[in-house]
Regions:
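N-terminal low-complexity, Pro/Thr/Ser-rich intrinsically disordered segments
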Residues: 29-58
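Structural signature of tandem-repeat unit edges
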Residues: 52-60, 72-89, 100-113, 123-136, ...
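Bacterial signal peptide processing site
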Residues: 21-24
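A structural signal for leucine-rich repeat
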Residues: 166, 188-190, 209-214
Length: 226
């Protein structure tokens, strides 16, 4: 059984999963723990396997996914837009950290933030489909994703945190919108040789990238104006 992340102290959750057996599209009620995390099984299936999620309720009424579990190995994970009627707005920290099976992750248009180390060392990850305006990439969110060849962020991205896109050795093309206001200078090292960063000409994003290149002459990046 493949786990999205190791979680300690979830004995009740394990018992719940074992009670589901091999039934398909099982529905699990809201079993909220004292820390305000709840167990949810979505009706979305890929082939014959359901994906179980643990979510964390956020103050704005949306949820963050901080754990997932599948009954069989799956190379594609499509994150749902909603869990139990609540909008999924965040990919929780370390959700896919160290994952060695998933090749494609499909994010819904509702996601606004990708948490700390969310895809850290997800070494088999080849593709992330981003359809909505993700605003924040937290620290080390894509660190060490050695199978990624391209990342494309739509308009709306504002912040790229510390080492968010670093040590992605196969990454050759990164597409950034002109909306990026903050890029930590500890990014883009140990990526493709060179890493081509596609940005709108004359944008704030391009100006920030130029500053980073001046302060770190060892970075092997190429700005491609579009």
């Amino acid at each position: 059984m493949k786990k999205g992340k190791i979680v300690l102290g979830l004995c009740g959750f394990c018992l719940l999963l074992s009670s589901c057996g091999s039934s398909q599209n099982a529905t699990v009620g809201n079993n909220t723990d004292p820390n305000n995390h709840s167990v949810s099984t979505t009706s979305m299936s890929r082939e014959t396997s359901d994906i179980q999620y643990l979510k964390k309720d956020l103050e704005n009424g949306t949820v963050s996914i901080w754990y997932f579990e599948t009954s069989t190995p799956q190379d594609t994970i499509a994150i749902p837009e909603e869990i139990n009627g609540k909008t999924v707005s965040q990919i929780g920290e370390r959700l896919f950290e160290g994952n060695e099976e998933v090749k494609t992750v499909i994010l819904p248009k509702t996601v606004r933030a990708i948490g700390n180390s969310a895809f850290n060392f997800a070494t088999t990850l080849e593709k992330v489909e981003i359809s909505g305006p993700v605003e924040i990439l937290e620290n080390s969110s894509f660190y060490g994703c050695n199978s990624l060849q391209e990342l494309n962020f739509p308009d709306g991205l504002k912040k790229i945190g510390d080492h968010a896109i670093t040590a992605c050795s196969s990454l050759t093309d990164l597409y950034l919108p002109g909306t990026v206001e903050e890029i930590d200078e500890d990014n883009f090292a140990l990526c493709g040789e060179p890493l081509k960063i596609h940005v709108p000409a004359g944008s704030e994003t391009e100006a920030r990238l130029q500053e980073i290149m001046k302060s770190n002459g060892d970075l092997n990046i190429q700005i491609v104006e579009e």
